[in-house]
Amino acid sequence: MLLALAQWLQGDASFLRLFTYLTFRAVMATITALGIGLVCGPWVIRKLTQMKVGQAVRKDGPQSHLVKSGTPTMGGVLILIGIAVATLLWGDLTNRFIWIVMLVTFGFGVIGWVDDYRKVVHKDPRGMSSREKYFWQSVIGLFAAVYLAFSVSEANNVRVLDLFMAWVRSGLSMGLPARADLMLPFLKSISYPLGVWGFIVLTYFVIVGASNAVNLTDGLDGLVIMPVVLVGASLGVFAYVMGSSVYSKYLLFPHIPGAGELLIFCSAMGGAGLAFLWYNTHPAQVFMGDVGALALGGALGTVAVIVRQEIVLFIMGGIFVAETLSVMLQVSWFKYTKKRYGEGRRLLKMAPLHHHFELSGWKETQVVVRFWIITLMLCLFGLSTLKLR
């Protein structure tokens, strides 16, 4: 919004050219989202407390968690408010990637909000059924996947539509330009052509998978938000590189026109996340809830797809991957041993993985900070792929 205003008034006030610089707007988006979160945080927490949306705590989990019962949840709305305001203020609202990422983020946020609302307001411990939740996630994920298959491949919406119609006329069998290929880290001249169907399937699993992986990780005070901020910031760097014809050529990456604007969104997400951490750090005053976790995971997945860094997301989000695998392995092993031996057995003391470490004697803050450190190292490793190719 401010970019459009600056471009309109630029002839009358030359200092407004500052607003056209992507890096300046990214910094301001961070500050704006951070400020909104810090200022509005107490009001949001107070309103959530008045709504009596207290978090229910598992009685079979670590005993130290029982004191958290009643802490207001659904605090992810604070993050979404910061992201929305900062992105709309400092982003280029004519950029198609901004809108598709916002659509996925807030679409998944609505799903999470409904799930949380049913759990804590209607006192329905099931919330949305898994089938219902995955259905709506799939609707949003597939829509985004189809759009991005053609949007990543072309420079503007007119050419996106032309490419889509050409695909339809080809009997749904046409391939995609090279910039839509799956990029392999550390290999500068090797990529894997996905085709339209391969792109759609991969994108669907990345977006929906990332959303649910972040949601599973959200189990301790401050645990998930810092990895989200770190991974989001790293993806913002990739977006800046991919969106620049100069840097992308120098670093041997495909140039994706318009992708650089995602730096604004990632910066807003980082600022909003840090503001939320102010109130979510141990002992937490508010929990994120599904409204925040599903939204942020979907956002990370969508940005990673646009900048063609799906594999790098898998690396940088290693904590999310480990948490998800721990649940899958725990459930699978329990079912297998119950069928084989007549009683279910566990691989871990408790899943997701962070609870296993708690029950192994780690304090909650130790688990959280160590997971942060691991994520920081993984993000630095992921960023090294910019040059080590």
From Swiss-Prot:
The gene is mraY. Its cofactor is Mg(2+). GO terms for molecular function: metal ion binding; phospho-N-acetylmuramoyl-pentapeptide-transferase activity; UDP-N-acetylmuramoyl-L-alanyl-D-glutamyl-meso-2,6-diaminopimelyl-D-alanyl-D-alanine:undecaprenyl-phosphate transferase activity. Its EC number is 2.7.8.13. The chain crosses the membrane at residues 25-45, 73-93, 97-117, 135-155, 190-210, 222-242, 258-278, 286-306, 311-331, 366-386. It is a multi-pass membrane protein. This is Phospho-N-acetylmuramoyl-pentapeptide-transferase. Belongs to the glycosyltransferase 4 family. MraY subfamily. InterPro entries: Glycosyl_transferase_4, PNAcMuramoyl-5peptid_Trfase, PNAcMuramoyl-5peptid_Trfase_CS. Keywords: Cell cycle, Cell division, Cell inner membrane, Cell membrane, Cell shape, Cell wall biogenesis/degradation, Magnesium, Membrane, Metal-binding, Peptidoglycan synthesis, Transferase, Transmembrane, Transmembrane helix. It is found in: Cell inner membrane. GO terms for cellular component: plasma membrane. GO terms for biological process: cell division; cell wall organization; peptidoglycan biosynthetic process; regulation of cell shape. Pathway: Cell wall biogenesis; peptidoglycan biosynthesis. The keyword Magnesium applies.
